Amino acid sequence: MNTLAASAAAHAQAVQSLDSIGITVSDMQRSLDFYTKVLPFESVSDGEVTGEAYEHLMGVFGLRLRVVRLRLGQEFIELMQFLAPRGRPIPVDSRSNDRWFQHIAIIVSDMEQAYSHLRKHNVEHASTGPQRLPDWNPNAGGVKAFYFRDPDGNHLEICQFPPDKGDPRWHGKSPLFLGIDHTAIVVADTETSLKFYRDTLGLRIGGESENYGPEQERLNNVFGARLRITALRAPAGPGVELLEYLAPRTGRPMPIDTKANDLWHWQVNFRAADTDAAAAAVRSGRYDYVSSGVIALPDAAFGLHRALMGRDPDGHAVTFIER
């Protein structure tokens, strides 16, 4: 076995699951009202941290951080409010093809009913309305989807799978909001991203498609959108979906000075059996660290003992955690 294959195999064993998706927010109470009242997430834990260990983990000096862990179905998100220092807002002209774009795909049992529910709560549209992807596309035909925004402007998606697509548990008739299938990120080049997520982290490809046409344009609200989509999976948990815009190539890169307290910051939290092995795999691929190294966390706050944050080739944050 060559060195790259050995590294990939070792790290594939170290990454046990996609534990959660972290989202930075500006006002925790406002966000909780949205995620638990407009959407039916349930609060699992709520706490604050400060101190040197968390500064070195998050790459933000002088932080005081509140984290609320929420559950929908079997999946988890973590809302993060930096009480200090405050970060920057999402650019008002953000588009779905900018490379800081990330969303979670919430599966619903009835698209029309879910959309009506969101309309009653006056959610901000990111799509023109729900779209049904055309049947000529064998890997996506029949999927219904709609993009909207949370109070900070973060993109979210509701999605309904037809009977022949998606995990069997997404075909239930109730509840209306079933869980999170994946988080999607915009990437500049799929092959470059696969070297990170597949070859270094050990995720497997679960499906691929090329989507275009008026339905896709209106879903993303990007004229002329043509996407290469690659679905990836860890051994457990929701997936990671790579979105490469083959057209238009006008999406802007992740700001090089992005910090975890900036409101466009999301992070994919992978549970690892050994964060040292994860760190070695990231370092072997010459990918960037956010953390100063693997950080031992005092008092096992949030049930975490050790953690490391790095960045993928496009600057999306990835965290390896030991619980």
Predicted regions and their residues:
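N-terminal beta-strand motif that seeds the catalytic metal site of vicinal oxygen chelate
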Residues: 2-30, 45, 101-106, 159-194, ...
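Vicinal oxygen chelate
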Residues: 17-26, 64-79, 84, 90-118, ...
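Fold-core signature of tandem repeat domains
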Residues: 18, 39-41, 76-79, 148, ...
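Core segments of cupin and vicinal oxygen chelate
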Residues: 24-75, 113, 120, 136-141, ...
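A cross-kingdom feature marking solvent-exposed beta-strand/loop segments within repeated
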Residues: 47-64, 84-102, 119-121, 126-144, ...
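Short secondary-structure capping/junction motifs at helix and strand boundaries
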Residues: 111-117, 124-128, 155
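A charged, solvent-exposed segment within the mature domains of Sec-exported extracytoplasmic proteins
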Residues: 140, 150-152, 160
